[in-house]
């Protein structure tokens, strides 16, 4: 490029220098701004003490709610299982009385009664050893009567030998009888004391004896 004079050349060079200076300055400034922004984004913001307390309370509430939910679920399942067990006991109790009242028992009925007798004897054997010899003798007597009833039922009989058996109505002791009867004569550890008290009644499960048992008539 040719210049007419030195003055025009100087002016042109000065203009070019200003342009380059402006361009370079702007680029440097934009880079520094972007770096400062990236640094500010990378640094985590400090959490205030109030926010920390709120977070802790929320965590505690969540844990408490989970524990309450688990506790409610456990109690609900426990109630359901208890209801199902009571219904099962009642159903077996009805089945036992229905079979026992039959004059002509089928082979399946006899097998069911025989199974009850065996289970009751096994349950009596599982009771802890009793120091009272009198109660021990009564338990042995019950076992013998259970075996005799088993033989008598197997021959088609409907009642124990040696006397007439009368049926009592299920009044106040109905719930107790159903609770103690499980259809297979299993005796829970919580009822052992009651079994000892009622052990003088012959028949199947001692808890059932008051329903069907009555002293011989003097007639």
UniProtKB/Swiss-Prot annotation:
Keyword list, A-Z: Nucleus, Transcription, Transcription regulation
Pfam family name, one: RRT14
Keyword Transcription regulation: yes
Main location: nucleus
Gene behind this protein: RRT14
Basic residues composition bias: residue spans: 34-44, 69-79
Cellular-component GO terms for this entry: nucleolus
Transmembrane segments: none
The organism's taxonomic lineage, starting at the top: Eukaryota, Fungi, Dikarya, Ascomycota, Saccharomycotina
Record family assignment: Belongs to the RRT14 family.
Protein name per Swiss-Prot or TrEMBL: Regulator of rDNA transcription 14
Classification via InterPro entries: Rrt14 (IPR031404)
Location within or outside the cell: Nucleus, Nucleolus
Annotated region described as Disordered, given as residue ranges: 27-79, 186-219
Function: Involved in ribosome biogenesis, probably through modulation of rDNA transcription.
Gene source species: Candida albicans (strain SC5314 / ATCC MYA-2876)
């Amino acid at each position: 490029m040719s210049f007419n004079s030195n003055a025009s050349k100087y002016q042109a060079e000065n203009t070019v220098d200003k342009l380059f200076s402006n361009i370079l300055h702007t680029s440097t400034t934009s880079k520094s701004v972007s770096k400062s922004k990236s640094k500010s984004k990378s640094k985590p913001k400090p959490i205030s003490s109030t926010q920390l307390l709120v977070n802790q309370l929320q965590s505690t509430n969540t844990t408490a709610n989970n524990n309450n939910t688990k506790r409610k679920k456990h109690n609900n399942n426990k109630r359901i299982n208890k209801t199902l067990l009571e219904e099962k006991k009642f159903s077996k109790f009805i089945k036992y009385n229905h079979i026992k009242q039959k004059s002509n028992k089928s082979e399946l009925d006899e097998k069911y009664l025989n199974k009850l007798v065996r289970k009751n004897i096994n349950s009596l054997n599982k009771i802890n050893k009793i120091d009272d010899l009198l109660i021990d003798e009564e338990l042995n007597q019950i076992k013998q009567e259970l075996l005799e009833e088993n033989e008598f039922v197997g021959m088609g009989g409907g009642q124990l030998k040696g006397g007439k058996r009368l049926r009592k109505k299920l009044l106040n002791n109905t719930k107790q009888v159903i609770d103690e009867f499980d259809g297979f004569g299993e005796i829970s550890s919580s009822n052992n004391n009651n079994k000892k008290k009622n052990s003088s009644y012959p028949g199947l499960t001692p808890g059932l004896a008051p329903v069907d048992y009555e002293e011989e008539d003097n007639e």
